[in-house]
Design a protein with these regions (language model features):
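Alpha-helical tetratricopeptide repeat
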Residues: 7-11, 19-27, 59
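TPR/TPR-like (Sel1-like) alpha-helical repeat modules
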Residues: 72-92, 101
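Intrinsic-disorder-linked linear interaction elements in eukaryotic regulatory proteins
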Residues: 3, 96-98
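Canonical positions in the second alpha-helix
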Residues: 13, 48-49, 84-85
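Short helix-capping/linker turns of helical repeat alpha-solenoids
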Residues: 15-18, 31-33, 38, 51-55, ...
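Structural signature of tandem alpha-helical TPR/SEL1-like repeats
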Residues: 2-9, 36-45, 71-81
């Protein structure tokens, strides 16, 4: 019941454009917490929040793209998303970004 209420409140704020609420919805859909699991909807809300610079949504959208959970992004977009997340202190984003650059430099 409380999860339902929280989801509906977050949904209202997400539709109003609040990136934290958009991120919460993305997490809920990704995990199936209080709502039916839906990776497409998760990526939709992560994309909305990432578009406003939300670091965790940027990371989640980049990872979702790498795992083919969402449609492909423009070339270099994954790196941009990871850079946003890394600039906000997400160690996982920095490590993944380094791994991507290393893999490109292999013969």
């Amino acid at each position: 019941m409380i999860l339902d209420f929280h989801f509906h409140v977050a949904h209202v704020y997400a539709r109003l454009g609040y990136p934290n609420a958009q991120h919460i919805l993305g997490q809920r859909y990704l995990q199936g917490a209080g709502v039916e699991k839906n990776e497409d909807m998760a990526m939709h809300w992560f994309r909305q929040a990432a578009g406003q610079g939300h670091p965790h949504s940027s990371f989640n959208l980049a990872v979702g793209t790498l795992r083919n959970m969402t449609m492909a992004l423009e070339e270099g977009e994954v790196e941009k998303l990871l850079s946003v997340a890394a600039a906000h202190g997400l160690l996982e984003a920095q490590q993944l970004l380094e791994n991507i650059f290393k893999s490109r430099n292999l013969p």
